Design a protein with these regions (language model features):
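General structural signal for secondary-structure boundaries
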Residues: 1-5, 100, 144, 173-180
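Membrane-proximal, proline-rich intrinsically disordered regions
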Residues: 1-35
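Conserved, well-structured interaction surfaces
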Residues: 9, 17-22, 46-126, 138-150, ...
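Short, surface-exposed recognition loops and adjoining beta-strand edges that mediate ligand/DNA contacts
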Residues: 26-46, 129, 165-180
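Outer-membrane beta-barrel translocator domains and adjoining extracellular loop/strand segments
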Residues: 133-136
């Protein structure tokens, strides 16, 4: 599969396209509709939806409500997509397809940074999350919130200084995450 630089970007971009989906929809309902600043009034027979909006408003949701399920699945799906892309790209000989080892390291650090993002969001929504380092890890128990926080911190402290620097505002970029300092 890895026969050109474009094929590495196809794998690198998958966790980022998942992120684009992830940042909207169900997360909005959990973080905005559950506050006093938003409301979702019932209009006729079509807005009740089995009481899911009511449960959000009154903070009586259950683990089976779609917003919770989709958020958990989206969070863990983002983590798994990033870990899978990382495993795939770590096995690629970048020099053989015309890319440098520095580009490879940058790609891996971008994936570590987005993995940290998904763990950070999971920590916000659910507290401690099971921590995985590889797609080959077996099922893991839930880690504590502190362990999850430390995992996020480690990923970011290692990734951010090693990311390629942002060269100019608004210019075309190679990759998805740049160090903007």
């Amino acid at each position: 599969f890895f026969t050109s630089p474009e094929s590495t970007y196809a794998v690198l971009c998958r966790p980022f396209t998942h992120w684009k989906w992830y940042i909207g929809a169900d997360r909005w309902y959990l973080q905005e509709l559950t506050t006093d600043e938003m409301t979702c009034p019932k209009r006729g027979a079509d807005w009740y939806n089995g009481g899911e909006y009511y449960r959000l408003h009154y903070h009586t949701w259950s683990p089976d409500d779609r917003f919770v399920v989709n958020t958990y699945d989206g969070t863990t799906g983002g983590i798994s997509r990033a870990l899978e892309a990382k495993a795939d790209l770590e096995g690629v000989d970048y020099n053989a397809i015309g890319l440098s080892d520095a580009v490879k390291a940058d790609h891996i650090n971008q994936l570590n940074a987005i993995t940290a993002y998904f763990y950070m969001k999971g920590l916000d929504y659910f507290g401690g999350m099971p921590i995985y380092h590889s797609v080959n890890d077996g099922l893991r128990p839930r880690n504590t919130a502190l362990e999850t926080y430390r995992h996020v911190e480690t990923l970011l402290k290692n990734a951010i200084p090693a990311l390629a620097k942002k060269s100019s505002l608004g210019a075309p970029e190679d990759g998805y995450i740049k160090q903007a300092a």
